[in-house]
C-alpha cells in the first residue's frame, strides 16, 4: 500500500473529544465551509458553548505536532433523536476516511446515550447514504414533540423543524435519517 493511500492516511488520524483549546482550529476549518454556504456559520461563542458536543480528528506530524483536520458534533434533540452537526474535514483530506471515522464516533456516542435515531441536514447525500442514512421528507417527530421543539432557541432545531425563518439556510440540503 502506498503512503498516499486513503487507508494509510486515515490510520494516522486520531479521533478524540474536542477541548476548548481546539476552538481556534475549528473556527479556521469551518470558515471555508460557511463562506461557501455548505455549513451554517457559527459564532465563536457558540463553538465554545457547544464544545462538549464536538469530536475532532487530528493528524500528528513527525515532530508530534497535532493538527485538527476534521470535526463533527452530536446534538441531542429529544430522548430518541440526535443530529449530526458541523461535520467537516480539511478539503485536502477528503476521501481519506476522516469523515468516516468522525461519523463513526458520533454514532457510537449516540448509541451510548440511548439515542435510536440520528438526523442530518446535508449536501453530502452520497456520504451519508453509504453510512445507512436515508432521505426523508417530513420532520420525523410526533406533534407533541414538534410543539416542544418549537420552544428551542437553537438554530439547528429550527432547521430540523423546517421553520420559515431558516429556510434560506437549508435550500438545497437533504434531510436524512438513520435508525440505530
Where are these regions (language model features)?
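Conserved acetyl-CoA-binding loop-helix of GNAT-fold acetyltransferases
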Residues: 95-108, 120
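Short amphipathic alpha-helix that is part of the acyltransferase structural core
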Residues: 2-40, 58, 64-67, 172-180
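A short, internal acetyl-CoA/4′-phosphopantetheine-binding micro-motif in the GNAT/acyltransferase core
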Residues: 87-94, 123
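A generic "binding-loop/recognition-motif" signal
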Residues: 22, 80, 123-124
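C-terminal "cap" of GNAT-fold acetyltransferases
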Residues: 141-180
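Conserved active-site alpha-helix within GNAT-family acetyltransferase domains
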Residues: 112, 116, 122-152
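A conserved beta-strand-loop-helix scaffold within acyl/acetyltransferase catalytic domains
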Residues: 41-55, 59, 70-89
